[in-house]
Each structure stands twice: as C-alpha cells, then as structure tokens.
C-alpha cells in the first residue's frame, strides 16, 4: 500500500484537469471547509478539483485558506489550485513559502511560481534552490527555474548534479540542458554511461550542442529497443570522438553520494 507521502508526491506530479463534475449546490466556502478538514489525499484532491472547476474566482479564498490553515497538505494543494486558476496575487505568499519547513510546501511553492511565470521571484527561487536538500523539492524547483529562464541557476545545478541520483539527477540534467551553454557539455557527457541519467544526458547534449543523435526511442530499459537506446549509444560515440575539443573541468566526473 502506498504511503500518504508517496501519494502526495504523485499528486504533486499530476496536473489538475477538468475531470470532476462541479457540485453546483454547494458553496465555495463550504467546499473549502471540507477540503481543509479532509485527510485522505485522494478525496482532498477531488474537492480541490471541484472548487477550481466550479469557481474561477476561487483564488482569493484559496489564498486565505493557505495562509491560515494548520494542515500542510491543505497548504500545498491550495497552491496548486491557485496556479490552476492563474491567481498571480498569491506570489508573495508563494515566495514566503519557499522557506517552509515542509518539503511538499516548498516544492509546490516553487512549481506554482514557475507555472504562474512570476519572473520577479528569481532571487527567492535561487536562494531556495541553493539550500534545498529534498529530492522532490529539487525537482520542482529545477522545473520552475526552467520556466522562468533563470540562467543564474547554472552554477548551482552543476554543484547539485553529483550529489543527487536517479530521477532527481535526470531533472537537474534536463534543467542544465535548457539553462546552460555549450560549456556545460563535458559535465553532462559524464552521465551518458549512467543507466538512469543517460537518456537525459543525451537530450541535454542534443539541446546544447545542436547535435542530432537520431530519432527518439519510445522505450527505455526493458523496452522493445532495449537499453541503452540507439541515440544514447550515438551520443556516447560522438562524445568519445569530440571530447578533446572541450577543455578539462574539475567537476566533470560524477561522484554520487545521494
């Protein structure tokens, strides 16, 4: 059985879609009260969808609830609701929430700032990203940094790459591929042999160096085409024959510790 926090992370990654019929007879205030008091995350998500589908003007009451609730799940889910409703007046609250003690609150605050394209949040996002140690929060912050095109994050991304593994490293490589420059190719190429991050490294190099490694495979490990996919093999061969063209860099050798 999935833990409540695992379900929470899944919900974090699931966009709000108009798939729940609005309960027209119930007021937004009543729905939000039930939403705050609900502890089952799936039911809580259902109530949030009902609110956002029913009331396009629910941004202000969602913000008031997020500011006043003692339930951290209510707080981070309300942030998602405000982002869905494009309620940009919540930006100061989101920025303050980047320092929250709950990782899911920080994650969603960062992601909502990106989704809402709050460009003047770059300083706060950079500070949060620099200090962040939670993998899921790192992932969502890296997505927000990409959405806001915060290129000043590149040195921080380079620092975090060898520290985190798995999916978090994939997100970081993807962010570096979008925010970095051709000077970042050697660092990224060091992950081409990684079973988890190899495909992300391939795509990042394709983006930064403008090199085509062939069509994207639709499968990964265990798929029809097997692993590594042809484009990653092509990227490895390309790097082997071209790496002498790049200067040596001290942080180009991955040292995994997380």
Where do the language-model regions lie?
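Structural detector for internal amphipathic alpha-helices that build alpha-solenoid repeat scaffolds
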Residues: 33-37, 41-54, 64-65, 73-88, ...
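Immediate post-signal-peptide N-terminus of mature secreted/exported proteins
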Residues: 27-29, 33
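Bacterial N-terminal signal peptides that target proteins for export
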Residues: 1-8
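Bacterial N-terminal signal peptides
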Residues: 8-18
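Terminal, low-structured helical/coil segments at or just beyond the last alpha-helical repeat
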Residues: 214-258
């Amino acid at each position: 059985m999935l833990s409540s926090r695992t379900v929470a992370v899944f919900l974090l990654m699931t966009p709000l879609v108009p798939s729940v019929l609005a309960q027209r007879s119930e007021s937004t205030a009543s729905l939000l009260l039930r939403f705050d008091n609900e502890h089952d995350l799936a039911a809580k998500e259902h109530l949030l969808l009902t609110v956002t589908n029913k009331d396009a003007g629910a941004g202000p009451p969602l913000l008031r609830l997020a500011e006043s609730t003692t339930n951290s799940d209510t707080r981070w889910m309300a942030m998602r609701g405000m982002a869905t409703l494009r309620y940009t007046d919540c930006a100061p609250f989101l920025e303050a929430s980047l320092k929250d003690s709950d990782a899911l609150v920080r994650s969603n605050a960062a992601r909502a700032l990106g989704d809402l394209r709050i460009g003047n949040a770059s300083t706060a996002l950079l500070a949060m990203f620099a200090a962040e140690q939670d993998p899921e929060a790192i992932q969502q912050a890296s997505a927000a940094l990409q959405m806001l095109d915060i290129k000043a994050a590149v040195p921080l991304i380079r620092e975090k790459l060898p520290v985190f593994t798995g999916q978090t490293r994939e997100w970081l490589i993807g962010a570096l591929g979008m925010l970095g420059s051709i000077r970042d190719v050697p660092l990224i190429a060091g992950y081409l042999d990684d079973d988890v991050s190899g495909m992300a490294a391939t795509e990042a190099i394709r983006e930064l160096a403008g090199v085509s490694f062939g069509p994207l495979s639709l499968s990964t490990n265990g798929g029809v085409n097997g692993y590594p996919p042809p484009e990653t093999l092509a990227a490895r061969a390309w790097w082997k024959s071209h790496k002498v063209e790049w200067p040596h860099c001290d942080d180009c050798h991955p040292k995994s510790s997380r």
